[in-house]
Amino acid sequence: MKYSIAFGALAQVASAHYFFDTTIVNGAASRSNEYIRASTRAVAYNPIKFSSNPPADIRDNSMFDKGDGICNQGAFTNAGKTKVLEIAAGEELTVKLGVGAKMEHPGPGLAYMSRAPDDDVVSYDGTGDWFKIYQEGTCGSGDFTKDAWCTWGKDHLSAKIPAGTPSGEYLVRFEHIGVHRSHVNQPEHYVSCVQVKVTNGGNGKPGPLVKFPAAYSDKDPYANFSIYNGAKDFPFPGPEVWDGASSGSSSESEAPAPVSSAATSAPTSAAPSNNGSDIEPAGNTEQEAPSTDGECGVEYVYV
């Protein structure tokens, strides 16, 4: 009984902060961190912030722009302990949150891929080129500070490996960004990387290409975005989603994605409908931003 109570409390806390630790392909779920690199953080569910944020709001000394934005703090040190998941091009890959948590911060879901040099993903630190395969923002006319976001209340993110992806070994980087404090330049990044071997691949040329952590900046529009003054299109960070075709442009610097709230993925993936994402959500008049200091504010305290 004590264990159940403690686990339930942890799940509540982790719905405010969370981490991905399980993969699902064709209905088959993995063990915790079987294919996802575990971080070495003292508290696994804490977010990753920019180094420019107040020191009191940076947890575990983890900073996006200091390398932790690639696959999370210390994740590469666990690469050798992590298996490589075989998945065919065109199949869907799902990552699920640990400890029964759900995403209860407003914000987008995204996924990227990066091919490992010499197709040796276990030895790859993720400092190479990345291309985006999925992003989604808002999905309906709910509360723009909560359930208008496609990811709200979910315990997973899913993305299809584009059919044109060449066979080989890759890191697949999944990310949820909490934007409830972006209005004070404090977006929260929740990042995990899956080690995969793509089979039955195509002859596509992925792109646009970016590098992490340089693909994002604390000066970017998404990092200074307010959800509290009415619904609006969200400026996704990073490049456009690769369409899975035979060509894709390359970039050494950040290639901003179009300003949009619609779900986007390669054609092999069924994108959720964007029901009125540009329309002011019903009953969602302009709201004042929380004045509470600290990482998440009073409205995001769950225990």
Q: What does each of the following model-derived ranges do?
A:
Residues 170-174:
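A short tyrosine-centered beta-strand micro-motif
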Residues 91, 168-169:
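Surface-exposed loop/turn positions
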Residues 161, 166-168:
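A glycine-anchored, Pro-Gly-centered beta-turn/N-cap motif
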Residues 175-179:
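Beta-strand-rich extracellular modules
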Residues 2-109, 113-156, 180-303:
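Peripheral, solvent-exposed domain-edge segments
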